[in-house]
Every structure is written in structure tokens, then in C-alpha cells.
């Protein structure tokens, strides 16, 4: 973190201390400087562009993720999941298992709405990222109002209890979509709030 802060600080010093004064003097940005200084200025320009491009890419990914949770997930618009997930996306779930492919991911997401049809994510209190990586904290909420399938034709009957849990999603993005996603939440708290945990 200190290294990143220092690098940004140095870029700012060079940009504002060297480039801008020469601009106000009516000369080109690197006119009158030694070859070494010109090289440093060009290097700083490239670093600054790299930094601003990365920030823009991160902002784009986070905007896509907002749309994913607030609209696509909450409203079960599964035909739009490809806007944020690659066809062969790998998804890592809180219980440790992983799945491959968008169709399987849609199937798993649909299952969450079978017993809690009002499941939703409407807020992202924390959103951070760096280039092709993002991490978002959300609040997932809903009400256990329908029978929960547990296999072999068996069901857990609804308790009518509401749940609201903090969750975190980390995403690795390529070409505008996630190629891998990590989901984190406390399953014990989730079950307890649904009224079926110890």
C-alpha cells in the first residue's frame, strides 16, 4: 500500500511539477529538458495512463456487478447472466465446492429462490477493485416461505423467517465478464436465520 501511495505521489509530483509549468510557459511538455528527464516524463505519462485506464476498467466492472446483483439476480433475469459471467465461468461456493459453466451457475442460483422467492441483494456497502479484479460486499436477504428441497423427494417446511446476511463476492474479469467468481457468506448464520440451524 505504501509503495502504491508513493508511486502515485511521485507521478503527481512529476506531472504537476514538471509538465504543467512548462505548459504554462508556452512550450511543449518536454521542451528544454535533458534526454534523461524527457525519458522520465514519458515513463510517468505511461504510468499515469496505465493507472487511469485501470481505474476506468475497475469502475466498469463494478458497475456491471451492481447491475448483476440489483437487477439480474434480484429479479431472476437469468437470460442476462452472460452480461457478467463467461460461458465457462468457474464459481467457488461458501461450502467449498466449485462449479463450471454458466448453465450450472444459473441452476444453482435458481435453487435459492425455490424456498425464498423474495431473495434479493439491493446494497453494496463496499466495492473495491484493481483492473481485472473486483471484490464487493453485499447484503443478501429474503424470507423462507416455500418448502426447501433436500433430496430424495424430501422437503424442509417453511418457517416464515426472514434472513439478512452479509456476503462477499470476488471476481476475476476477462473481456468484460467474470471468468472466475468466489462467493463468501456464513452458512451457519444463514441456516440459523432461516430457522433450521442449531
Each PLM stretch: what is its role?
Residues 9-19:
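Bacterial N-terminal signal peptides
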Amino acid at each position: 500500500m505504501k509503495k502504491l501511495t508513493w508511486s502515485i505521489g511521485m507521478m503527481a509530483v512529476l506531472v504537476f511539477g514538471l509538465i504543467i509549468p512548462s505548459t504554462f510557459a508556452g512550450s511543449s511538455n518536454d521542451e528544454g529538458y535533458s534526454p534523461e528527464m524527457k525519458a522520465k516524463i514519458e515513463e510517468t505519462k505511461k504510468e499515469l495512463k496505465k493507472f487511469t485506464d485501470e481505474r476506468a476498467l475497475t469502475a466498469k466492472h463494478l458497475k456491471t456487478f451492481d447491475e448483476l446483483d440489483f437487477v439480474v439476480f434480484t429479479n431472476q433475469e437469468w437470460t442476462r447472466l452472460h452480461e457478467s459471467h463467461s460461458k465457462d465461468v468457474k464459481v467457488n461456493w461458501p461450502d467449498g465446492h466449485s462449479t463450471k459453466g454458466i448453465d450450472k451457475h444459473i441452476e444453482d442460483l435458481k435453487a435459492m429462490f425455490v424456498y425464498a422467492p423474495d431473495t434479493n441483494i439491493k446494497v453494496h456497502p463496499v466495492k473495491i477493485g484493481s483492473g481485472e479484479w473486483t471484490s464487493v460486499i453485499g447484503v443478501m436477504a429474503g424470507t423462507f416461505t416455500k418448502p426447501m428441497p433436500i433430496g430424495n423427494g424430501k422437503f424442509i417446511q417453511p418457517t416464515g423467517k426472514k434472513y439478512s446476511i452479509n456476503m462477499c463476492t470476488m471476481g476475476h474479469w476477462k473481456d468484460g465478464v467474470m471468468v472466475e467468481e468466489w462467493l463468501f457468506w456464513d452458512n451457519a448464520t444463514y441456516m440459523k436465520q432461516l430457522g433450521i440451524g442449531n
